[in-house]
Amino acid sequence: MCGSTLMREKEVVGCMRTMVFIGTSKSGSSREAIRAAERLGFYTVLFTRRKLNLEQRAEFSDVHELISIDLDDVPSMREKIKQLQKQGKIIEAIVSFVDGLVYTAAVLSEEFCHTDLSKEAILKMEDKIQTRSALQKTPFNMNYAIYKQGSLSFFIEENELTFPLIVKAPHSAGSKDVLKVDRKSEFESCVNKLKQKYPGSPILVEEYIDGPQYLVETLVYQNKVNIVAIIEQEISKEQRFIVTGYSLLTKVEEHLYESLSRAVISIIRMLGMKNGACHLELKFHKNQWKLIEANPRISGGAMNKMIEVAYGINLAEQIIKIAIGDAPS
């Protein structure tokens, strides 16, 4: 072993079919994806910035090679990938199941593996403002405005905003950066906090809408959208929006499924996803589906396990198949 690269002693016969993962959590969907890749016969390489992963190497037996690297330093990752190739590893895909890293992985995978993982669509989903722009003048958007700088009072008047409102940091996937405000003083406070936290970033301001909220997990292969699971979400209605419960719907009323699937397929096509996976969060408001958020990955946490228990589908494994150009089964 040398430097920060740790390799599990293992004899690999024939071509070393390799899959590179950019980032992971210790458990949950991103970790289960690595286990799925190992089951499929891949030599698994993990790029990580978490020192915890290196310190607890024995707990990552499904990771054959663990490389400590700055995941924001794309040139350094390129050099590491080239080194892996020089060692004889046949890299078939570079993937990530982690917020903010899916686009980087898709770009590197296209560059080194000639895969087609709809990187432009991923980029739109990782930026909430780009998502809204892609759905401009469609019924799936609620009223929204983009605050960059200047008087907040003038911004409210100019855009004819009425409370309550939702304030979002466009590049954050965390619920801590999605805030409900009921009055002008709260609005000014929340916007200023987000501007301090993300200097130079615009702020997305949306109309607050009521209605039941659903999370829809999808797989997209060669332009065909497959709805894998529909989950009704319980959302706290405090200032921060936190999911407090999931109800995976094993039986969905026909009219609900038909209207929801039409909306999901339309939205995914407008965003340009042709190959890959994404989950959408939608509300049904005044007889119309409204997109709350789109994310270019499977939900984290226990989602992969929930779907496997309910339907017998390992969604992370199916995503890996799409990443290497195979049809999901």
Predicted regions and their residues:
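ATP-binding N-terminal substructure of ATP-dependent carboxylate-amine bond-forming enzymes
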Residues: 11-121, 325-328
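Residue-level detector of intrinsically disordered terminal segments
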Residues: 6, 15-18, 151
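Short acidic-hydrophobic, aromatic-tinged amphipathic segments that line or gate anion-handling sites
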Residues: 66-72, 145-149, 181
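Glycine-rich phosphate-binding loop of ATP-grasp-fold ATP-dependent ligases
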Residues: 143-144, 164-193, 203, 210-217, ...
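ATP-dependent carboxylate/phosphate-activation module, predominantly the ATP-grasp catalytic core
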Residues: 207-273, 277, 284, 291, ...
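A conserved helix-loop-beta module that forms one wall/lid of the active-site cleft
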Residues: 110-177
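Peripheral (often C-terminal) accessory segments that flank ATP-dependent C-N-forming ligase machineries
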Residues: 3, 20, 44, 153-157, ...
